[in-house]
Amino acid sequence: MFRPSTSLALRSTLRQLASASNQPIPPGSEINAVKRTVATILPPIRLYRRIIRAHRRLDPDMRAVGDNYVKDEFRRHKNIDNPLQIIGFLSSWKMYLDQLEVQQGQPGGFRGQRLDPQLLEKMSDEQIYQIHELMTATQEAYSDKAQAFPPEKQRELAEKAAADAGLSVKKDE
């Protein structure tokens, strides 16, 4: 997954990351959340595994989208050598994990969050395009007009079509 380079600075950074806390950050101000997140960054493989584990509590469709996105992002960033980029990447994913864990503990589960307009202004065109693609994919997964339906919806449609045709459908138990 993530292979640290032989540079001394990166080794010391990874050593500091390995000694970080596992506790999720409670909701609070964004500035304090960033400071606390940086103080509790997890090593890359451990962070990746915790995110994948947290996704298990999502809806199956959201889990599939989230797992694929996380896997792709970690693959894209596995050869980064710049410690600042590594810290930025890991702290952003740690903030996501903390938000996911806090929201999953609340009634109604994970609901997501709107992006900060200031954050959008700082993004490159490629990053904005990636977010737009992710938004489109998730909207299509839950749209009644979409060509591909989530698995539960496909079963419902198949059962309805069979009932309309006068056929009985065997139910799995």
Swiss-Prot record:
InterPro entries xref list: SDHAF3/Sdh7 (IPR008381)
Q: Where in the cell is it found?
A: Mitochondrion matrix
Principal place where this protein is found? mitochondrion
Note the Pfam families from the entry.
Complex1_LYR_2
List, alphabetically, the CDD domains matched.
Answer: Complex1_LYR_SDHAF3_LYRM10 (cd20270)
Q: Does the keyword Nucleotide-binding apply?
A: no
Q: Which GO terms describe its cellular component?
A: mitochondrial intermembrane space; mitochondrial matrix
- Keyword entries, A-Z: Chaperone, Gluconeogenesis, Mitochondrion, Transit peptide
**Transit peptide extent on chain:** 1-59
Assembly and interaction partners: Interacts with the iron-sulfur protein subunit within the SDH catalytic dimer.
Sequence similarity: Belongs to the complex I LYR family. SDHAF3 subfamily.
Protein name per Swiss-Prot or TrEMBL: Succinate dehydrogenase assembly factor 3, mitochondrial
Q: What is the source species? A: Mycosarcoma maydis
